[in-house]
Every structure is written in C-alpha cells, then in structure tokens.
Design a protein with these regions (language model features):
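Viral virion structural and adsorption modules
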Residues: 1-161
C-alpha cells in the first residue's frame, strides 16, 4: 500500500490516504488516481512512508521525507520533508534539519543514571532555556516499573503532539 498525505494551500496535512501499489506504481500515478477519485488537485497529494520517523527508519531502509505525515504536520516543499506539529513544545524550540523534528536550544534530553531512573525526571525550563532535573514527589517503585506495560509512558517519556 502506498500512502499519500492530502495537503491544503498552506501545506498542512489534512489526512493520509492509502492507494494500492498496483495503482500507485509511482508518486505521479498515485497523485493522478487520487485527483480522479477525490477531486483534490494531484499536486496536493504527497507520498509518505509510515516507516520514517525523525529522518530514520524502523525497518533499516532509507528514510523518506523526514517523517511519516500525520494530520496537522507541515509539508516543506523546498526541503521535501514533513515537519511534526510543534504541539506543546515551547516557543524557544527550533527545527532540527538533521532529524526533522523540534529540538530544544540545549539539545536533546540528557540521560538519567540507572540510580536516578525511578526517582528523577527532566523538565524544560523556558526561562533559563535549560533542562531541569527534578525529583518525583512520590518515586516510582521497582515493582510499579516492572509491572508497567509501557515503561516510557510510566516515566513520562512519550511525546505528546
């Protein structure tokens, strides 16, 4: 299945549609099919790849257009990439043209030591433009951690868009 992002006149992704591979033999064929079936202009259907995230891939292949397009993402025609929604990221965060994602001016989130993993967390401080290490009011117990089906969610590491 080939996937195409429908973009508006401001290059914002409205939705992602699927087209059978035998129809979308290349991007132009998929665009023509979508224009014919939806009435939306072919030039506003942009092929995307669900395996691409932060300019890398989950399956070891080559990244395609920076990120898999999501609703609200921005299509950058000059860079030929999809930018994620800035979402809750603070005003100081900028576009990283290597990862095609938003990044703090202080860089990536520092790692916690193994001893700190269940007792501390990082929070962005927009006033100082730095990561601030804080201690949980109620630390996570090892039993809670071991029982959690999603460790990243438990530790607050899931990115919210």
């Amino acid at each position: 299945m080939a996937e195409f992002a429908k973009i508006d006149e401001n290059n914002i992704v409205l939705r992602v549609d699927h087209v059978e591979d035998n129809i979308a033999t290349d991007e132009a064929a998929g665009q023509a099919h979508l224009e014919e079936t939806t009435g939306w202009p072919a030039a506003q259907w942009i092929m995307t790849d669900k395996n691409t995230h932060r300019n890398g891939t989950l399956n070891g292949g080559s990244p395609f257009r920076g990120n898999y397009a999501g609703i609200g993402y921005e299509w950058d025609p000059s860079e030929q990439v999809f930018w994620p929604i800035k979402g809750d990221n603070p005003a100081s965060w900028v576009k990283n043209t290597t990862t095609y994602d938003w990044e703090s001016p202080a860089g990536l989130l520092p790692d916690l030591t193994d001893d700190e993993l269940l007792t501390h967390y990082w929070r962005w401080d927009e006033g100082t433009l730095q990561w601030e290490k804080l201690e949980y009011a109620t630390p996570i117990t090892q039993a809670e951690y071991d029982a959690a089906p999603d460790k990243d969610e438990l530790l607050g590491r899931k990115r919210k868009y």
